[in-house]
A protein has these predicted regions:
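Alpha-helical transmembrane segments
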Residues: 81-85
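Alpha-helical transmembrane segments of multi-pass membrane proteins
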Residues: 87-96
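Interfacial/capping segments of alpha-helical transmembrane domains
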Residues: 95-106
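Cytosolic-side membrane-entry/anchor segment at the start of a transmembrane helix
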Residues: 106-114
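Well-ordered alpha-helical segments within folded domains of soluble proteins
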Residues: 129-133
Length: 291
């Protein structure tokens, strides 16, 4: 009995050690991603993008810009939304099968890895890392770092607000409630019925997109989007979200991060043009994104 208990305790310690190592490595990569964002920037410090009153005015302006974007969409934008919705509906029809396949292949090791990446997508972690970047930018007088930090938080907050409202309105049951993927309880404040869309996916993609948009380093873009993808997929693995929840949440986060970044570029326009362009003479489909 004691031998079995010691073995169990030893296994638990090993798993915790492995998880700590994975967490440390992941956070180190994320920190590299953030601190590398301002590399190569030749802009001087104009004194903008600081923790002052302008921060709140800018947030209000940008939130309005994101929220009102659909009012400025045209036919091409409708095609883009239709394409994303189509993929989402396709995943929705297979959500139950995907969930069963993933859950049937979970292992203690995959649980450890998924828990690390799920931690990466936590809002508090993302805000904390943005805070580190802002502090470095403030100390070293790097406006690009401060800008990326503040826009990252702005994108995260905007995504969180829009996602929470959608979650409550839709009221989709989470996989771990043992309800089917077609179970809904609209206007529910029960966390078990706030599966769609994934808040983790929306938040981490909003931040990753902001970092990528401000970065001049390709490696940073790759790392940011890779971490965002793994963090999002971990929610399917952990049985907290259906595949369609994660896909739509990721798309929402991406476009929010993209929109807010472009609203804060010199000479940026406040309208968005997203669409599919069909080439002449063939059925080629091209995604065009214009801000």
């Amino acid at each position: 009995m004691r031998v079995g208990l010691k073995h169990a305790q030893s296994t638990d310690v090993t798993r915790k050690t492995r998880k700590r190592c994975l967490s440390a490595a992941t956070l180190a990569i994320m920190l590299f991603c953030i601190l590398s964002t301002g590399m190569g920037s030749s802009r001087t410090d104009s004194g903008e993008y600081k923790l002052d009153k302008e921060l709140f005015r800018r947030f209000g302006r940008d939130f309005k810009g994101v929220f009102s974007s659909p009012c400025h969409w045209g036919k091409k934008d409708a095609l883009t939304v239709a394409a994303i919705s189509g993929v989402g509906l396709l995943l929705y029809s297979f959500d139950g099968d995907i969930n069963s396949w993933v859950q049937g292949r979970r292992t203690p090791s995959s649980d450890d890895v998924a828990s690390v990446f799920s931690y990466v997508g936590n809002g508090g972690v993302l805000v904390g890392l943005a805070g580190v970047m802002y502090a470095v930018g403030a100390i070293d007088h790097k406006e690009s770092w401060r800008k990326t930090a503040l826009l990252s938080v702005e994108s995260l907050v905007t995504a969180s607000i829009l996602v929470w409202g959608t979650k409550v309105i839709v009221g989709r049951a989470r996989p771990d409630t043992n309800e089917s993927s077609h179970t809904f309880d609209s206007f529910s404040f029960d966390s078990g019925y706030q599966s769609f869309p994934s808040g983790h996916a929306a938040g981490v993609f909003a931040v990753a997109t902001t970092i990528a948009e401000q970065s001049d380093v390709l490696a940073v873009d790759i790392i940011a989007y890779s971490l965002a993808t793994l963090a999002s997929l971990s929610r399917i693995h952990d049985n907290r979200h259906w595949a369609s929840d994660v896909f739509i949440g990721s798309a929402l986060g991406y476009f929010i991060g993209k929109k807010i970044s472009d609203l804060n570029r010199p000479g940026a326009k406040n309208t968005v043009s997203l669409g599919f362009d069909f080439s002449h003479g063939r059925q080629a489909l091209t995604l065009s994104i214009r801000f």
